[in-house]
Amino acid sequence: MCVVRTFWFAVLTVIFAVSCSSHSVIENDKPTSLKVGEGFVNPLGYYEASPRFSWKPSISNSKSTQQSAYQIQVSSTPEGLLTNPDKWDSEKIKSSAMSWVQYKGKKITSREKVFWRVRFWDENNIASQWSDVAHIEMGLLENLDWKASWIGAKDTESSLSPSQSTLATPQYLRTQFSVEKEVLEARLYVTAKGVFKVYLNGKDITANDALPPGWTPYEKRIETLTYDVTTLITKRDNALGAIIAGGWYSGRIADLKETDHSKPPRFLAQLEITYSDNTTRLVTTNDSWKATQSGPIRFASNYDGERYDETYEMQGWSMPDYDDSEWGTVITDASTPGTLLRPKRHLPVRNVDKLTPLSFKQVSKDTVIFDFGQNMVGVPSIKLPVKQGKQVTLRFAEALHKGDFYTDNYRSAHSTDYFLPAKDGIAEYTPTFTFHGFRFVEISGFDETKAPVKNWIVANVQHSDIDLYNNFLSANPKLNKLFENINWGLKGNFFDIPLDCPQRDERLGWTGDANAFIAPSMYMADVYGFWSAYLNSLREEQTEDGFVPLYVPFVKWINWTSSGWGDAATILPWELYMMTGDQKILEDSYPSMKSWINYHDSQAKNNISSMMTFGDWLQPYPEAEGKGANRGDTDFSLISTAFFARSVALTRKTALELGFNEDAKRYEVKQKTLAKAFRAEFFDEDLNVIKGKETQTAYLLALAFDLLPQSEVNIAQTKLISLLQSADTHLRTGFLGTPLLADVLQEAGRTDLVYELLFKETYPSWFYSINNGATTTWERWNSYSLEEGFNPQGMNSLNHYAYGTISRWFYEGILGVKPQLPGFKKAIISPQLTSKLGFAEGSIPTPSGDIDVSWTMTSDGFDVSVTVPFNISAEFVPPAHYSVVAATNAKNEPIKKWKGLKAGQYQFQLIIDEKHGGAQ
């Protein structure tokens, strides 16, 4: 029982809380990390009318381990939370749920701002304090909320064959308005068909954003953003200005021509001002705006770069006193009824860091190459001496070889920026409507009488605004470098959508790459919102017959699908669910999953699939030559049938989670039927592959997807290991096999082979790229070598995250943490120890908090330290061949049971089993 006495005094209130339990929440404990949806903190312009709430406890000084109940209050005012929560009071709900708790109150409407707080009860029914107050402000949730019109420069009026200048020359737009009253609040709701910058009274509202609103299936949905501009509006004349460019909407996409995407960019904005007397004012895009294409940005392309002519600058063009009499009128376009306008589902791409050059080399009197030491994505900012009329050119490269600038792997992407100075002196320039993947920048055309210096240039690192955890470290410097490279690959390719690469004439959201990297990225960064938004786009692009494009958003370039790629419809939602425990991702995706199964079925005969496939993409040492070599040696039908079975299995699991039991029964029958057909079609009685070549990936698919009878699992494992050993313990896997390799070998009891593969120095291996100077993960296992130079194939990205899939095993293998239940409600902790690694440490993010694991090799074994967060139950499982000789809790008290470990810190001492004679 807890006794609380409250004494009121004139000056202050003192609350004494006395707990009779030794296992209770202490007075200062209260929920923290209040978030809504997929991780938004106090969002402005939120997208979900019925939000989901999440929180974590702050119980570092208490002995509580579990939540038994919670209470959420939501009100239209902060004060209302204390007296009358007018939107929702859940009252006390008996539940351990701390994440994705569904709002069940009164309707929340567009623009509305609500305030919320939460408290919880621990396992002894002791209540925490109330959390601090958090808030949510909605964006415009429905198309009907928009009173604005789409506008663009008159000269860009749609035609059947617009010129390149029509599409690629940015449009400058502006309007003026007066404010006569005191402003209480002002919100700017804005978007574009294309990309935009917005200015209010000369202030760049989007200064930290890059290429908003981002890339969605434009015919289905365009995302909108909300900005608080209250402090920028003056009680007099005001001006609202914008620049729009094609971005991903019009002009060049991938290696297609401008005319393949010939709809010119358009702009939509709605400024809503609330005065202190609670009256309102709307300023919208309409036919009164003015426009010009005679601004200084003369050309802009995501792929080809930007051309800036200083002689066209229009000083003060977004200020209210600017003379726009020579500007033209705008045209207005009707809204497309089928296109949804919805608030952005994840944070935009932003400028997140700056890099300075490590070194530079002058290669001619007016040309210098700067080396930033890191392959990255973004744009440069230059500040350097120039001569009037002498063009400054900036070229980009991911690598040099013997001093030569390497751009062959950009293929047809020019990726070049140009700056034309209007006068002698020091010029400053940062590209606005493009982005580049690069480590090196070549600048030519500067004032050759001046000697280059490092501070002429900085690199602006851009990526989707995500939190990176930097949550793994080991005793092996190359393993740490590999983690760092994968981390940079994540940053560079998470550019509003998950790009395959950030530098060449492609930069698309390939689904197969996403399958390989979704789980690793969830361990490495706060990317749930990013992935759920991408998955939403995938569902929108899926056709009625279940067809899923190779890349999302889809552009008409490669108009077929592939097994192992389109299966993102089932793989992505299930991986997200296991990592988060958020059932909504399954609810939203289940119809799409079923539809994809139907499409798979349409491509199969007698349960053997003939679906097109890219195969085990970029498998090393293929037998085929030419372009066919890229697809690897594993039989295509084997691959497609295996992924058919995998998608059925995941859809069955989803049906069970959602309570669709009849569906689950039907899918269970189908799964077993496919497994039998797979076994009979592709293997003989001795489990030798009889269609196509016997490959590591053939056995990996069979084992990872449970397609063999239990009695044959050991046989398949033995054959896989034999193939590895015959390759001198080198992998022979591409995009489909590599993600499965480590886990299958661990399941076979051969983590020694995983470590051998991981630490392999020669081609093909992860350390091979590091030994050859990589600072990000490569597309190919042999993209470059110091001796031979670059792979001759043009498709040779040096920043490709797919092979970063191995980082999943850093968390699930080296640290040994896996979810036993969705959202890590129950977790297995079984670090895979090895004498090849002196120590390893890291944290595994869960909705309830981090699971921390560290281990260190000792003279006779290993010491393992584990921290289990509040509300999670964990089981410690010694790895194969090891025994626990001592286990203690944070008080150094011995513990005898390692199953059902509650929140707290634990230490384990392990030794190698004597019969095994030594550590692996």
UniProtKB/Swiss-Prot annotation:
Keywords: Cell membrane, Hydrolase, Lipoprotein, Membrane, Palmitate, Signal
An annotated GO cellular component: plasma membrane
GO molecular function, one term: alpha-L-rhamnosidase activity
Signal peptide from the UniProt entry: 1-19
Binding site for alpha-L-rhamnose: D500, R504, D505, E506, D513, W565, H800
InterPro entries: 6-hairpin_glycosidase_sf, 6hp_glycosidase-like_sf, Alpha_rhamnosid, Bac_rhamnosid6H, Bac_rhamnosid_C, Bac_rhamnosid_N, Ig-like_fold, Rhamnosid_concanavalin
PROSITE patterns named among the record's database cross-references: PROKAR_LIPOPROTEIN (PS51257)
Major localization listed first in the record, in broad terms: membrane
A GO biological process held by the record: carbohydrate metabolic process
Family matches, as Pfam families: Bac_rhamnosid (PF05592), Bac_rhamnosid6H (PF17389), Bac_rhamnosid_C (PF17390), Bac_rhamnosid_N (PF08531)
Cellular compartment(s): Cell membrane
Enzyme class, first EC level, given as a word: hydrolase
Its EC number(s): 3.2.1.40
Keyword check for Zinc: no
Lipidated sites in chain (S-diacylglycerol cysteine): C20
Lipid moiety-binding residues (N-palmitoyl cysteine): C20
Membrane topology, as annotated: Lipid-anchor
Catalytic activity: Hydrolysis of terminal non-reducing alpha-L-rhamnose residues in alpha-L-rhamnosides
Active site: E506 (proton donor), E779 (proton acceptor)
Family matches, as Gene3D superfamilies: 1.50.10.10, Galactose-binding domain-like, Immunoglobulins, Maltose phosphorylase, domain 3
Function: Alpha-L-rhamnosidase involved in ulvan degradation. Ulvan is the main polysaccharide component of the Ulvales (green seaweed) cell wall. It is composed of disaccharide building blocks comprising 3-sulfated rhamnose (Rha3S) linked to D-glucuronic acid (GlcA), L-iduronic acid (IduA), or D-xylose (Xyl). The enzyme is able to degrade p-nitrophenyl-alpha-L-rhamnopyranoside (PNP-Rha) in vitro. Incubating the enzyme with the products obtained after degradation with ulvan lyase and beta-glucuronyl hydrolase (i.e.
Family classification: Belongs to the glycosyl hydrolase 78 family.
Name of the protein described by the UniProt record: Alpha-L-rhamnosidase
